Protein backbone atom coordinates (compact mmCIF):
# COMPACT_ATOMS: atom_id res chain seq x y z
CA UNK A 1 0.00 0.00 0.00
CA UNK A 2 1.26 3.48 -0.81
CA UNK A 3 1.66 6.03 1.92
CA UNK A 4 -0.86 8.83 2.32
CA UNK A 5 1.70 11.40 1.17
CA UNK A 6 2.30 9.48 -2.04
CA UNK A 7 -1.39 9.31 -2.68
CA UNK A 8 -1.94 12.95 -1.90
CA UNK A 9 0.67 14.18 -4.36
CA UNK A 10 -1.30 12.89 -7.33
CA UNK A 11 -4.53 14.18 -5.80
CA UNK A 12 -2.99 17.60 -5.20
CA UNK A 13 -1.61 17.61 -8.74
CA UNK A 14 -5.05 16.91 -10.21
CA UNK A 15 -6.62 19.49 -7.93
CA UNK A 16 -3.99 21.99 -9.07
CA UNK A 17 -4.65 21.22 -12.73
CA UNK A 18 -8.39 21.76 -12.46
CA UNK A 19 -8.14 25.01 -10.47
CA UNK A 20 -5.85 26.43 -13.14
CA UNK A 21 -8.38 25.42 -15.79
CA UNK A 22 -11.03 26.99 -13.58
CA UNK A 23 -9.07 30.24 -13.58
CA UNK A 24 -9.30 30.34 -17.39
CA UNK A 25 -13.08 30.21 -17.05
CA UNK A 26 -13.05 32.94 -14.42
CA UNK A 27 -10.90 35.10 -16.68
CA UNK A 28 -13.61 34.54 -19.30
CA UNK A 29 -16.28 35.62 -16.82
CA UNK A 30 -14.24 38.75 -16.11
CA UNK A 31 -13.03 39.87 -19.53
CA UNK A 32 -15.49 38.19 -21.93
CA UNK A 33 -18.85 39.05 -20.45
CA UNK A 34 -19.94 40.60 -23.73
CA UNK A 35 -20.13 37.03 -25.06
CA UNK A 36 -22.44 35.35 -22.57
CA UNK A 37 -22.77 31.57 -22.63
CA UNK A 38 -26.01 29.99 -21.39
CA UNK A 39 -26.23 26.51 -19.88
CA UNK A 40 -26.31 24.41 -21.93
CA UNK A 41 -24.69 26.47 -24.66
CA UNK A 42 -26.29 27.50 -27.93
CA UNK A 43 -24.31 25.94 -30.77
CA UNK A 44 -25.25 28.43 -33.52
CA UNK A 45 -23.45 31.67 -32.86
CA UNK A 46 -20.99 30.33 -30.26
CA UNK A 47 -17.43 30.46 -31.53
CA UNK A 48 -15.62 27.13 -31.38
CA UNK A 49 -12.74 28.33 -29.20
CA UNK A 50 -15.18 29.72 -26.64
CA UNK A 51 -17.25 26.53 -26.66
CA UNK A 52 -14.34 24.17 -26.12
CA UNK A 53 -12.77 26.43 -23.47
CA UNK A 54 -16.04 26.26 -21.59
CA UNK A 55 -16.31 22.49 -22.08
CA UNK A 56 -12.80 22.09 -20.67
CA UNK A 57 -13.80 24.15 -17.64
CA UNK A 58 -16.69 21.75 -17.04
CA UNK A 59 -14.08 19.33 -15.74
CA UNK A 60 -13.34 21.48 -12.70
CA UNK A 61 -16.31 21.25 -10.35
CA UNK A 62 -17.01 17.49 -10.63
CA UNK A 63 -13.32 16.62 -10.27
CA UNK A 64 -12.91 18.94 -7.29
CA UNK A 65 -16.02 17.54 -5.58
CA UNK A 66 -15.13 13.89 -6.14
CA UNK A 67 -11.61 14.59 -4.83
CA UNK A 68 -13.16 16.23 -1.77
CA UNK A 69 -15.02 13.01 -1.03
CA UNK A 70 -11.91 10.93 -1.67
CA UNK A 71 -9.83 13.17 0.58
CA UNK A 72 -12.45 12.83 3.32
CA UNK A 73 -11.92 9.07 3.30
CA UNK A 74 -8.12 9.49 3.34
CA UNK A 75 -8.49 11.80 6.36
CA UNK A 76 -10.58 9.14 8.07
CA UNK A 77 -8.06 6.40 7.22
CA UNK A 78 -5.16 8.51 8.50
CA UNK A 79 -6.86 9.28 11.82
CA UNK A 80 -8.74 5.98 12.11
CA UNK A 81 -11.78 7.84 13.36
CA UNK A 82 -15.16 8.36 11.73
CA UNK A 83 -16.05 10.85 14.46
CA UNK A 84 -13.00 13.05 13.75
CA UNK A 85 -13.83 12.92 10.05
CA UNK A 86 -17.43 13.86 10.72
CA UNK A 87 -16.33 16.86 12.80
CA UNK A 88 -13.78 17.90 10.18
CA UNK A 89 -16.33 17.73 7.37
CA UNK A 90 -18.90 19.66 9.37
CA UNK A 91 -16.49 22.42 10.40
CA UNK A 92 -14.90 22.78 6.98
CA UNK A 93 -18.24 22.66 5.22
CA UNK A 94 -19.62 25.45 7.38
CA UNK A 95 -16.40 27.41 6.89
CA UNK A 96 -16.74 27.14 3.10
CA UNK A 97 -20.35 28.29 3.25
CA UNK A 98 -19.22 31.30 5.30
CA UNK A 99 -16.51 32.08 2.74
CA UNK A 100 -19.02 31.90 -0.12
CA UNK A 101 -21.51 34.20 1.60
CA UNK A 102 -19.05 36.84 2.79
CA UNK A 103 -15.63 36.72 1.11
CA UNK A 104 -16.25 35.16 -2.29
CA UNK A 105 -19.54 36.85 -3.07
CA UNK A 106 -17.90 40.23 -2.45
CA UNK A 107 -15.10 39.31 -4.88
CA UNK A 108 -17.71 38.76 -7.60
CA UNK A 109 -20.14 41.59 -6.88
CA UNK A 110 -18.10 44.25 -5.08
CA UNK A 111 -21.16 44.96 -2.91
CA UNK A 112 -21.13 45.19 0.87
CA UNK A 113 -23.60 44.80 2.29
CA UNK A 114 -24.87 42.84 -0.71
CA UNK A 115 -28.39 42.89 -2.10
CA UNK A 116 -27.69 39.65 -4.01
CA UNK A 117 -25.72 36.61 -2.85
CA UNK A 118 -24.79 33.98 -5.43
CA UNK A 119 -24.67 30.46 -4.01
CA UNK A 120 -21.97 28.99 -6.23
CA UNK A 121 -19.48 26.14 -6.24
CA UNK A 122 -17.88 26.78 -2.84
CA UNK A 123 -21.33 26.86 -1.27
CA UNK A 124 -22.20 23.59 -3.01
CA UNK A 125 -18.99 21.91 -1.83
CA UNK A 126 -19.50 23.19 1.71
CA UNK A 127 -23.11 22.04 1.95
CA UNK A 128 -22.17 18.69 0.39
CA UNK A 129 -19.49 18.24 3.06
CA UNK A 130 -22.04 18.94 5.78
CA UNK A 131 -24.35 16.29 4.32
CA UNK A 132 -21.48 13.80 3.91
CA UNK A 133 -20.65 14.32 7.58
CA UNK A 134 -24.08 12.93 8.38
CA UNK A 135 -23.78 10.02 5.94
CA UNK A 136 -20.41 8.46 6.74
CA UNK A 137 -21.85 6.42 9.61
CA UNK A 138 -23.84 4.37 7.10
CA UNK A 139 -22.56 1.13 5.64
CA UNK A 140 -20.62 1.22 2.39
CA UNK A 141 -23.44 -0.57 0.62
CA UNK A 142 -25.89 2.18 1.50
CA UNK A 143 -23.43 4.93 0.64
CA UNK A 144 -22.97 3.43 -2.83
CA UNK A 145 -26.76 3.13 -3.21
CA UNK A 146 -27.33 6.74 -2.14
CA UNK A 147 -24.56 8.10 -4.36
CA UNK A 148 -25.50 6.21 -7.51
CA UNK A 149 -29.23 6.75 -6.98
CA UNK A 150 -28.73 10.51 -6.81
CA UNK A 151 -26.33 10.66 -9.75
CA UNK A 152 -28.34 8.35 -12.01
CA UNK A 153 -31.83 9.28 -10.90
CA UNK A 154 -31.93 13.01 -10.29
CA UNK A 155 -32.69 13.88 -13.93
CA UNK A 156 -36.03 12.12 -13.48
CA UNK A 157 -36.87 15.04 -11.18
CA UNK A 158 -36.22 17.74 -13.78
CA UNK A 159 -39.90 18.54 -14.28
CA UNK A 160 -40.75 18.64 -10.57
CA UNK A 161 -41.97 22.04 -9.42
CA UNK A 162 -43.44 23.48 -6.24
CA UNK A 163 -44.44 26.84 -7.69
CA UNK A 164 -47.62 26.94 -5.60
CA UNK A 165 -45.76 26.16 -2.35
CA UNK A 166 -43.11 28.84 -1.73
CA UNK A 167 -41.32 27.12 1.16
CA UNK A 168 -40.93 23.86 -0.76
CA UNK A 169 -40.03 25.79 -3.91
CA UNK A 170 -37.18 27.56 -2.11
CA UNK A 171 -35.93 24.23 -0.78
CA UNK A 172 -36.15 22.83 -4.31
CA UNK A 173 -34.11 25.77 -5.60
CA UNK A 174 -31.38 24.78 -3.14
CA UNK A 175 -31.55 21.11 -4.08
CA UNK A 176 -32.23 20.82 -7.78
CA UNK A 177 -33.38 23.89 -9.69
CA UNK A 178 -31.66 27.20 -10.27
CA UNK A 179 -33.78 29.99 -8.91
CA UNK A 180 -34.11 33.06 -6.73
CA UNK A 181 -34.82 32.93 -3.01
CA UNK A 182 -36.06 36.34 -1.94
CA UNK A 183 -36.45 37.92 1.47
CA UNK A 184 -38.61 40.91 0.62
CA UNK A 185 -36.63 43.86 -0.67
CA UNK A 186 -33.74 43.16 1.71
CA UNK A 187 -31.71 40.48 -0.04
CA UNK A 188 -31.96 37.80 -2.73
CA UNK A 189 -30.09 34.51 -3.04
CA UNK A 190 -29.35 32.99 -6.44
CA UNK A 191 -28.94 29.21 -6.26
CA UNK A 192 -26.38 29.01 -9.04
CA UNK A 193 -25.27 25.52 -7.95
CA UNK A 194 -28.25 23.37 -6.87
CA UNK A 195 -26.67 20.93 -4.47
CA UNK A 196 -28.44 17.55 -4.76
CA UNK A 197 -26.29 16.07 -7.58
CA UNK A 198 -23.11 17.33 -5.88
CA UNK A 199 -24.07 15.38 -2.75
CA UNK A 200 -24.09 12.30 -4.97
CA UNK A 201 -20.68 13.17 -6.42
CA UNK A 202 -18.96 13.85 -3.07
CA UNK A 203 -20.38 10.60 -1.68
CA UNK A 204 -19.10 8.80 -4.78
CA UNK A 205 -15.59 10.13 -4.07
CA UNK A 206 -15.81 8.91 -0.47
CA UNK A 207 -16.99 5.47 -1.65
CA UNK A 208 -14.17 5.20 -4.19
CA UNK A 209 -11.68 6.01 -1.45
CA UNK A 210 -13.15 3.46 0.95
CA UNK A 211 -13.28 0.78 -1.73
CA UNK A 212 -9.80 0.95 -3.27
CA UNK A 213 -7.59 3.37 -1.29
CA UNK A 214 -6.88 0.85 1.46
CA UNK A 215 -4.46 -1.95 2.29
CA UNK A 216 -6.30 -4.40 0.05
CA UNK A 217 -4.73 -2.94 -3.10
CA UNK A 218 -1.23 -1.85 -4.01
CA UNK A 219 -0.63 1.19 -6.21
CA UNK A 220 -0.66 -0.75 -9.49
CA UNK A 221 -3.90 -2.57 -8.71
CA UNK A 222 -5.55 0.59 -7.42
CA UNK A 223 -4.63 2.50 -10.57
CA UNK A 224 -5.93 -0.35 -12.69
CA UNK A 225 -9.29 -0.20 -10.92
CA UNK A 226 -9.41 3.61 -11.10
CA UNK A 227 -8.68 3.45 -14.82
CA UNK A 228 -11.43 0.88 -15.20
CA UNK A 229 -13.87 3.12 -13.35
CA UNK A 230 -12.92 6.06 -15.55
CA UNK A 231 -13.23 4.16 -18.82
CA UNK A 232 -16.51 2.57 -17.73
CA UNK A 233 -17.90 6.00 -16.86
CA UNK A 234 -16.97 7.45 -20.25
CA UNK A 235 -18.25 4.35 -22.06
CA UNK A 236 -21.59 4.60 -20.28
CA UNK A 237 -21.71 8.28 -21.20
CA UNK A 238 -21.19 7.47 -24.88
CA UNK A 239 -23.85 4.73 -24.87
CA UNK A 240 -26.45 6.88 -23.12
CA UNK A 241 -25.61 9.89 -25.27
CA UNK A 242 -26.05 7.85 -28.43
CA UNK A 243 -29.40 6.53 -27.21
CA UNK A 244 -30.35 10.17 -26.63
CA UNK A 245 -33.29 9.50 -24.32
CA UNK A 246 -32.21 10.23 -20.75
CA UNK A 247 -29.56 12.06 -18.76
CA UNK A 248 -29.47 15.43 -20.56
CA UNK A 249 -31.06 17.40 -23.36
CA UNK A 250 -30.98 15.64 -26.72
CA UNK A 251 -28.15 16.28 -29.17
CA UNK A 252 -28.60 16.46 -32.93
CA UNK A 253 -26.81 16.25 -36.25
CA UNK A 254 -25.69 19.76 -37.17
CA UNK A 255 -24.67 21.34 -40.52
CA UNK A 256 -20.95 20.67 -39.90
CA UNK A 257 -19.08 17.83 -38.21
CA UNK A 258 -17.56 20.24 -35.69
CA UNK A 259 -20.98 21.55 -34.71
CA UNK A 260 -22.23 17.96 -34.39
CA UNK A 261 -19.39 17.18 -31.96
CA UNK A 262 -20.23 20.38 -30.10
CA UNK A 263 -23.87 19.30 -29.84
CA UNK A 264 -22.81 15.86 -28.56
CA UNK A 265 -20.62 17.41 -25.83
CA UNK A 266 -23.03 20.21 -24.97
CA UNK A 267 -24.01 19.07 -21.48
CA UNK A 268 -25.96 20.68 -18.66
CA UNK A 269 -23.98 21.86 -15.63
CA UNK A 270 -26.66 23.61 -13.53
CA UNK A 271 -27.51 21.22 -12.00
CA UNK A 272 -25.00 18.70 -13.37
CA UNK A 273 -26.79 16.10 -15.44
CA UNK A 274 -26.08 12.38 -15.29
CA UNK A 275 -24.18 12.61 -18.57
CA UNK A 276 -22.22 15.66 -17.39
CA UNK A 277 -21.10 13.72 -14.31
CA UNK A 278 -20.26 10.53 -16.22
CA UNK A 279 -18.11 12.38 -18.75
CA UNK A 280 -16.23 14.66 -16.39
CA UNK A 281 -15.75 12.30 -13.44
CA UNK A 282 -14.60 9.63 -15.89
CA UNK A 283 -12.00 11.97 -17.35
CA UNK A 284 -10.98 13.03 -13.85
CA UNK A 285 -10.31 9.47 -12.69
CA UNK A 286 -8.22 8.79 -15.78
CA UNK A 287 -6.23 11.98 -15.18
CA UNK A 288 -5.66 10.91 -11.56
CA UNK A 289 -4.13 7.64 -12.76
CA UNK A 290 -1.92 9.43 -15.30
CA UNK A 291 -0.72 11.97 -12.74
CA UNK A 292 0.03 9.16 -10.27
CA UNK A 293 2.48 7.79 -12.85
CA UNK A 294 4.31 11.09 -13.39
CA UNK A 295 3.95 12.78 -9.99
CA UNK A 296 7.71 12.78 -9.41
CA UNK A 297 8.41 14.70 -12.63
CA UNK A 298 9.62 18.30 -12.11
CA UNK A 299 6.85 19.79 -14.26
CA UNK A 300 4.21 18.31 -11.96
CA UNK A 301 5.52 20.17 -8.88
CA UNK A 302 3.76 23.47 -9.72
CA UNK A 303 0.46 21.59 -10.04
CA UNK A 304 1.05 20.00 -6.64
CA UNK A 305 1.79 23.41 -5.12
CA UNK A 306 -1.37 25.00 -6.54
CA UNK A 307 -3.41 21.97 -5.48
CA UNK A 308 -2.06 22.03 -1.93
CA UNK A 309 -3.56 25.49 -1.26
CA UNK A 310 -6.79 25.41 -3.30
CA UNK A 311 -8.96 27.72 -1.23
CA UNK A 312 -6.20 30.30 -0.75
CA UNK A 313 -5.63 30.32 -4.51
CA UNK A 314 -9.37 30.52 -5.18
CA UNK A 315 -9.84 33.61 -3.05
CA UNK A 316 -6.65 35.35 -4.17
CA UNK A 317 -7.23 34.87 -7.89
CA UNK A 318 -10.80 36.22 -7.66
CA UNK A 319 -9.63 39.43 -5.98
CA UNK A 320 -6.74 39.78 -8.43
CA UNK A 321 -9.19 39.47 -11.33
CA UNK A 322 -11.50 42.04 -9.76
CA UNK A 323 -8.59 44.46 -9.29
CA UNK A 324 -7.41 43.91 -12.87
CA UNK A 325 -10.90 44.50 -14.24
CA UNK A 326 -11.43 47.73 -12.29
CA UNK A 327 -7.99 48.93 -13.36
CA UNK A 328 -8.77 48.17 -17.01
CA UNK A 329 -12.08 50.03 -16.82
CA UNK A 330 -10.33 53.02 -15.23
CA UNK A 331 -7.63 53.09 -17.89
CA UNK A 332 -9.59 52.16 -21.02
CA UNK A 333 -13.25 52.55 -20.17
CA UNK A 334 -15.90 50.10 -21.31
CA UNK A 335 -15.07 48.63 -24.71
CA UNK A 336 -18.02 46.27 -25.28
CA UNK A 337 -21.25 47.96 -24.28
CA UNK A 338 -21.33 48.21 -20.49
CA UNK A 339 -18.29 45.94 -20.09
CA UNK A 340 -14.57 46.13 -20.64
CA UNK A 341 -13.54 43.06 -22.56
CA UNK A 342 -10.97 41.51 -24.84
CA UNK A 343 -11.72 40.54 -28.42
CA UNK A 344 -10.35 37.00 -28.66
CA UNK A 345 -10.55 33.81 -26.60
CA UNK A 346 -6.82 33.35 -27.13
CA UNK A 347 -6.28 36.52 -25.10
CA UNK A 348 -8.13 34.91 -22.20
CA UNK A 349 -5.68 32.02 -22.26
CA UNK A 350 -2.74 34.43 -22.44
CA UNK A 351 -4.03 36.33 -19.40
CA UNK A 352 -4.47 33.03 -17.56
CA UNK A 353 -0.91 31.93 -18.31
CA UNK A 354 0.46 35.26 -17.10
CA UNK A 355 -1.58 35.02 -13.90
CA UNK A 356 -0.43 31.45 -13.31
CA UNK A 357 3.22 32.51 -13.49
CA UNK A 358 2.61 35.63 -11.42
CA UNK A 359 0.71 33.84 -8.64
CA UNK A 360 2.97 30.79 -8.37
CA UNK A 361 5.60 32.36 -6.04
CA UNK A 362 2.89 33.41 -3.59
CA UNK A 363 1.30 29.94 -3.68
CA UNK A 364 4.73 28.35 -3.16
CA UNK A 365 5.39 30.49 -0.08
CA UNK A 366 1.93 29.96 1.37
CA UNK A 367 2.14 26.20 0.78
CA UNK A 368 5.44 26.07 2.69
CA UNK A 369 3.97 28.22 5.47
CA UNK A 370 0.91 25.98 5.67
CA UNK A 371 2.95 22.80 6.00
CA UNK A 372 5.32 24.29 8.58
CA UNK A 373 2.49 25.61 10.76
CA UNK A 374 0.02 22.75 10.97
CA UNK A 375 -0.79 23.82 14.51
CA UNK A 376 -2.65 26.84 13.07
CA UNK A 377 -6.03 25.20 12.60
CA UNK A 378 -7.51 27.52 10.02
CA UNK A 379 -4.69 26.75 7.58
CA UNK A 380 -5.93 23.21 7.01
CA UNK A 381 -9.12 24.68 5.56
CA UNK A 382 -7.15 26.66 2.94
Q: At which residue positions do the language-model features occur?
A:
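Alpha-helical transmembrane segments and their immediate juxtamembrane cytosolic regions
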Residues: 1-382
Amino acid sequence: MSTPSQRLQAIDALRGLVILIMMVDHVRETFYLHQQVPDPMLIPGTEESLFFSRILAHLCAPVFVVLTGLSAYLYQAKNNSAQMTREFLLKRGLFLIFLELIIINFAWTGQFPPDVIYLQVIWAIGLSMVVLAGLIGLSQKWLWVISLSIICGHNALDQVSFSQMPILQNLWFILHERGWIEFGDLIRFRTSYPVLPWIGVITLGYCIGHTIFNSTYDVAKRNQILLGFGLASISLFIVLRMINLYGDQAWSIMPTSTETVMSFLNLTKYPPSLLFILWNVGLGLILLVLLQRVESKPWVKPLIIFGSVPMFFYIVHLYVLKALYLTAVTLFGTTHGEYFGVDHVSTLWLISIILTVALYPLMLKFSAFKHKNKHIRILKYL
